[in-house]
Swiss-Prot record:
Protein name, per record: GTPase Era
Region listing for G4, in residue ranges: 122-125
Family annotation (Gene3D superfamilies): 3.30.300.20, P-loop containing nucleotide triphosphate hydrolases
PROSITE patterns, alphabetized: G_ERA, KH_TYPE_2
SUPFAM superfamilies, alphabetized: P-loop containing nucleoside triphosphate hydrolases (SSF52540), Prokaryotic type KH domain (KH-domain type II) (SSF54814)
Single biological process term from Gene Ontology: ribosomal small subunit assembly
Topology in the lipid bilayer: Peripheral membrane protein
Length: 293
């Protein structure tokens, strides 16, 4: 009988560097939400893939940046906390952008924690004027770290990365069933799907000023699911924008969210969205517990 092996790794880095895209690419499912806007991921998203005798557990994390408000600070703390749960730490680097102070701060903190990260130089499928300089800097200043040039979007060199990761796995019973892709509750995933559509369909800063909670999940006789969700905002004016003229905006968001849920869960969904105003919700620990940060 083949002995089971397990290994875990976390993916950290700046916002929009490709962390969520990489998780989705590796597990082969759209689990972690991805938008063109920064700071989309708010909590640790656990992905699972079982390759032959090895189970790989990976943690997508919020982007690391210079936080200002209470929510932003909680997100960054959440990202750093993931390091304690993983066997390997992957620092994903956007090769289309120059190194800045935040990147240097990340490297300094990793060094202070005695962590030798694996560098994932992402977006190499696009020509970059910074690529050679980044490689030279990392090679000279971090000779003990491995460097994998990859493209999370196209999948370039991902097989080689996975071969390295599985080669580091140790004999240990799997923590999850062979076909599991996450340990996140379906209610949480459904809320994330709606939050993604809010990012795509609302302008400017409004998506950062809200949260989504799944309040009801009911399996009906025909095996379809009735889902009630609440979009929580801090101002009445935000509620007006989300609702749109005659409710047109929230209907559009609801329709797109429902389609994504049906695609992910594999069963019909009846989705009902509501908007509630809770002033200063960002200061309420109840919401942070729900968001898992």
């Amino acid at each position: 009988m083949t002995k089971q092996k397990t290994i875990s790794f976390c993916i950290i880095g700046r916002p929009n560097s490709g962390k969520s895209t990489l998780l989705n690419r590796i597990i082969g499912e759209k689990l972690s939400i991805v938008t063109p806007k920064v700071q989309t991921t708010r909590s640790i998203i656990t992905g699972i893939i079982t390759l032959k005798d090895t189970q790989v557990i990976l943690y997508d994390t919020p982007g690391i940046f210079e936080p200002k408000g209470t929510l932003e600070k909680a997100m960054v703390r959440c990202a750093w906390s993931s390091l304690h749960s993983a066997d390997l730490v992957m620092l994903i680097i956007d090769s289309l952008k120059p190194f800045d102070d935040v990147m240097h701060d990340i490297l300094d903190k990793l060094r202070s924690l005695n962590i030798v990260p694996i560098f994932l130089l992402n977006k190499i499928d696009i020509e970059s004027k910074y690529l050679d300089d980044i490689k030279a800097f990392l090679t000279e200043n971090h000779p003990d770290s491995l460097l994998f040039p990859i493209s999370a979007l196209s999948g370039k060199n991902i097989d080689g990365l996975l071969e390295y990761i599985t080669g580091k796995a140790k004999i240990s019973p799997w923590l999850y069933a062979e076909d599991d892709i996450t340990d996140l509750p379906m209610r949480f995933i459904a809320a994330e799907i709606t939050r993604e559509q809010l990012f795509f369909n609302l302008q400017q800063e409004l998506p950062y000023k809200l949260t989504v909670q799944t309040e009801k999940w009911e399996v009906l006789k025909d095996k379809s699911i009735k889902i009630n969700q609440v979009i929580v905002v801090s101002r009445e004016s935000y509620k007006t924008i989300i609702l749109g003229k005659n409710g047109s905006k929230i209907k559009e968001i609801g329709a797109k969210s429902r389609m994504q849920m049906e695609r992910f869960f594999g069963f019909p969904v009846h989705l009902f969205l509501f908007v509630k105003v809770r002033e200063l919700w960002e200061n309420n620990q109840e919401f942070y517990q729900y968001m898992k940060i």
